[in-house]
């Protein structure tokens, strides 16, 4: 079997790239997906009568009009609802005036530092004092270690109460294995702006991603990817994974023995999930340095008394790090689902749970150099990494689609 473009993975990256080629009149491609259905981390299943997104919480951010217009070709805009994000943090804090040391549960909107005004004044005062003393506000040099950097950036109290425990739950037990290079985009937490926010009783600063988002009216987020997969007809192979890539001859061998020769191989799958034949030892060693986490998505059938779309839980006394309140964005549904790093997950009898072996690429200290080396080697062999796993970067689906569209524009002229 031969194709000019052999596309590995039928998630948002692979599906977008393939459909862009098709839309340009290029039909010399084939897509390989190991699962029986396409969508990758954005797949949905019907659970308790309604869709559940089995790869976590995925929504279509409105900020990239070109991406939205592209996806609306497969699932028209009138089939989506548009929401203003309501995300919150549930945190247990000891009231400063308490003599017992017992914690009390508080809820505030995300991001934490922009919504301190929602807490009691005694808590506001504590956080304001901590922010004023933060290293980034006092000319102290930027620390090298992750935990020290978080404290330097946000102040010791936000770090201790929220950022450090939450990131520990979501990413790694030893946070100092993570680098700090990916945190530089976070704005400084200004004492003056935080104080003014508390006085005016409103959030300050720019809002996080998905401030406004689309979600299907009648389906899960996986529906749009299913429709994109259907457009590919016999150019899509499902239900069989990739065993190896012959980097010298650009031959992909599938687990069932099928061999596909390509002029270009577009890989959207994790690098450590496939054998790279003819790759030198230093490349294989670099791949071993690319780390990731697994998650378990578990459905809970009870309705919660909240308007939030999702809620973050930094408390180390519970396994999961966030919940997605399905009933607030999926019309006619009930309940919610939890997202838990698999290392922390403790299955209970009767759990309805889905495990994603590859959920989040980790921004470890060694990652930038390692992935750069892998991608450089691969590209010289006409193997191109694309998307969350091909580039080993924590891209949301809209970013992945955007990158796939741009790559297709570039490759169409090759």
Specify the residue positions occupied by each region the protein language model found:
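Conserved Rossmann-like nucleotide-cofactor binding loop
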Residues: 13, 37, 272
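Mid-domain catalytic core of redox enzymes
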Residues: 24, 241-250, 254-359, 373-377
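Conserved flavin/dinucleotide-binding core of flavoenzymes
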Residues: 44, 325-414
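Glycine-rich FAD pyrophosphate-binding loop
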Residues: 22-47
